[in-house]
Amino acid sequence: MCSPASSKILYRNPRFLRVAFLQLHHQQQSGVFCDALLQAEGEAVPAHCCILSACSPFFTERLERERPVQGRKVVLEMGGLKIQTLRKLVDFLYTSEMEVSQEEAQDVLSAARQLRVSELETLQLEGGKLVKAPQGRRLNRECLQPPAAAPISARVVGPKSRPQTPLPVTQTPSPLGAVRLKSLGEEEGAHKKTNLPNADSLSDTQLKKKARVCLTQESRSSPSSQREGPKETKSNPGPTALPSLYPSVDEQLLPRKIRLSRSKPSPHVYTSTPSSILSGPSSMPTAPGRRLWRQRTVSKEAQGVDKQKPGEVRPLQSTPDPSDVGKPAENKKQSPELRAPTSSSVEEGQVGRVKLRKIVNGTCWEVVQEPPLRNTQDSPQILEPSDVEEPSGTLLSSVNEQEIPARIQLCQDSPESPRLQDILLSASHSPDHPMVKSEFGSSPMLTGKESDLNIDCREPYTFDTTLLGQPCEAEQYRITSAAATSELEEIFDFMLCGSDVEPPVGSLESPGAEGCRTPSYHLSETGKNWIEGEEWCLPDMELWPRDLTGLEKEPVSENKEPVEPFSPLVMRSENTESFEPLSPLVMPSEVSREELSLRGSWTPDLEITSSQPLDGQGEKLLHFDSSDPSQRSYNHLSPPCSDWAETGLEVSLGMDDVLCPVPKAVREVSANPEQLDPLPGSSEDEEIDVVDWTVEKKLGPTSVPSVWPDPSSESETEVDILT
């Protein structure tokens, strides 16, 4: 405006826009030229698409997608908005003015943010007034709003990643069968050897037993090592690495219980022989507590019990840690007994709580038997004849006494019990178990604790070895004599090497049924006598480990009469040239000695020799001549289980691979486990009437259901086992 000629005139009239918009507002109010309808709550608000799109990017996007057809109006559904709020907003678009109550203000502001009305979405209600939020806040809000979407995505991602982490956890648990054992094995690294057979033979019932024995076994806590041992038998390469990962999961599961049961046995027996166990399945012995039991279960599986894998059972047989297997089983069986009656407290005649009873018949028996099978695999360790001869008779007798009651109870509990009992008896009779324990670093302690510790550490393996080593052809074990021989040889090799693993017999019989002593039966030649004065004690712990311990503690003199086949449980060790089938619980002493020599704790008294071959003696009865209470106990035990077959003494053998199939007699016994009297609270207090095995001599071949000890061979005193 400097010069009229050159200057340009600039004129501004803010009212015009206002007037124009007011005119548009009138048109909107009257619905003239309106090409859009905004619907909410069933009502519609007319509007101009150009105005809507100019004031809100939200409407711009919507109208671009839904362009109005010529002559028709676009209908936009405004879900979630109140009609009054919508009207207020549209009025503001046309007039830039709005009058609302405080209650409506929040709705209008939220709707403005939803519809992205720029001049309203930045407002906020403060002190009854609508004021523009500071730009800082606005920026923050803007940042927060986009992040709002991000959080959603983040949430999605977060859950995804979380599931991924759990998935690995789930995946890791997926191999729980192996993983549990592994993890347990690592935990029980110290006790691998002790519990190795147990873990393999553990069945569900066995696991329950472990839970029972859990307290005592916890003290023995070396389940990780034991489990590792069985793991190695199953899968040596993987289990070693996995144990660390799985221990928590497995331990949380039954395996923890297994640890408890294993821990007691491992400290004593496996310290000495860790090398052999570790070299083979020892790394898994921690898990072995379970595995050992599973392996025994596998034997039962062979008999019809599927709780344990046959592979596991064989690992027990071949695993150099049969003692481990036996121990965990024993620990489980013993720990209850250890809690209540220790080996010292529980004397020959005493019978402690038998948790084996609680265990499912099939399951319990499976656990006991499977460790023997594993021992067969570990035969090299188990089959040390010198060690077998070395075991102290006293320990064997006491252990035998303790174990025999447990075996009887097993017979009562499950159809397979007869076989188990036979195996237990034979294992208990062999003096090897005590010897084996002494050989182990902890063996001396075990010898001292013969009833308590021997069961855990030495006897389980010793018994396992005997069982593995002495398959009865008459009993027809799955394992051929050649296979059994090879396994037995391996066991002997391991034993010579000083491995902790003992034959399944040890695992079957508790290393030291603490507080329980089972009469040990002498399966040795007629010249040998059972140790008298020892009474059957039913251990609270699982049958196999306890039984082994009882036999171990209880010195048994060799039978004067040749051992005769009683039940399929009797096994013939390769070491023994000929062995007669023993009663389900009895195993040839010679085999025990040779196989169980590794267990220094075995007493020579328990030595069982058979003048006649097992196969040929299927019909003959065992004769026990002994002044030992174990012999007495056994005689007394027989009457309650007068018909081992009837009583269901047959015990499914976890050592099917190692041993020939159990004779029909044993199986019959197992079929009638109920007939057997429950384990007596105290063997001493109660007497077990044992029919003369000689009288019932040749009750029948191994197939004959009932087997009776020979009263002439056994001690004069008879003990009646009361439930």
From Swiss-Prot:
Q: Which residues carry this modification: Phosphoserine?
A: 414, 682-683
Where on the tree of life does the source sit, at the highest rank?
Eukaryota
Query: Where is the stretch described as Disordered?
Result: 150-176, 188-350, 370-394, 603-637, 699-723
What does the record note as the disruption phenotype of the gene behind this chain? Mice are viable but show male sterility due to defects in spermatogenesis. Retrotransposons are derepressed due to DNA demethylation. Defects are caused by impaired piRNA biogenesis.
Basic and acidic residues compositional bias, start-end: 303-312, 327-336, 617-626
Q: Where in the cell is it found?
A: Nucleus
For this protein, the record's SMART domains field holds:
BTB (SM00225)
Q: Which CDD domains match?
A: BTB_POZ_BTBD18
Please name the GO terms of the biological process aspect recorded for this protein, alphabetically: cell differentiation; male meiosis I; piRNA transcription; positive regulation of transcription elongation by RNA polymerase II; spermatogenesis; transposable element silencing
Residue spans of biased composition, Acidic residues class: 713-723
GO cellular component term of the entry, any: nucleus
Which keywords appear in this protein's UniProt record, sorted alphabetically? Differentiation, Nucleus, Phosphoprotein, Spermatogenesis, Transcription, Transcription regulation
BTB domain location is 34-102
Regions of biased composition (Low complexity) lie at 217-227, 271-286
Q: What is the tissue localization of expression for this protein?
A: Expressed in testis.
Where are the compositionally biased (Polar residues) regions? 162-174, 195-205, 627-636
Q: Which InterPro entries match?
A: BTB/POZ_dom, BTBD18, SKP1/BTB/POZ_sf
Q: What does this protein do?
A: Specifically required during spermatogenesis to promote expression of piRNA precursors. The piRNA metabolic process mediates the repression of transposable elements during meiosis by forming complexes composed of piRNAs and Piwi proteins and governs the methylation and subsequent repression of transposons, which is essential for the germline integrity. Acts by facilitating transcription elongation at piRNA loci during pachytene.
This one is known as: BTB/POZ domain-containing protein 18
Give the organism the record lists: Mus musculus
Which gene does this sequence derive from? Btbd18
